[in-house]
Amino acid sequence: DNDTLYITADTLKSISKPRQKANNNPEDSTKLIVTPAPPTLPDTIRTFYAYRNTRILKSDMQAVCDSLTYASSDSIFKMFGTPVLWSDSTQFTADTIYLHTKNNKITQVALLQNAFVANKVQQGIYNQIKGKFVDGYFTNGQIKTVHVRNNAESIYFMQDENKAFSGMNQSRSAAIR
């Protein structure tokens, strides 16, 4: 999948450095010699920084934040400064957002401090979850499971088999799964 990711910001910075690999010294087993690995593509750690007015655009998600970092070693986008992430019809906000990816697809989103998730059911109706921390897990680009920790609250609109709204569930707990 050659889906392109676009990132804009006032300042962009990219750093590449070779991974370090350890070699044991056969003459002295108490010594560990660390030498730089040759700078081949798979052995290079790439770190990317975006500062001020950062925007991300991809076919399956968009995001805005003040700044972000990304490291190829763990494939996590770390967004800071009032980050907002949109994926499909779901909006995620928190003080900090960690977006985990694998093979260019979102696998997990971690919302740290003041986490809030809103999912549009139809015009003017949103299922909502909030808490101190929220972890969302994705399958095939769609959010499938959400775990809320510390001061968890949710509002969920129930629908019958004909998609007619049949009620609203409001919950509060220490955690919601």
Residue locations for each model-derived region?
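Structural signature for solvent-exposed beta-strand/loop edge elements and short helix-capping sites
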Residues: D1-R177
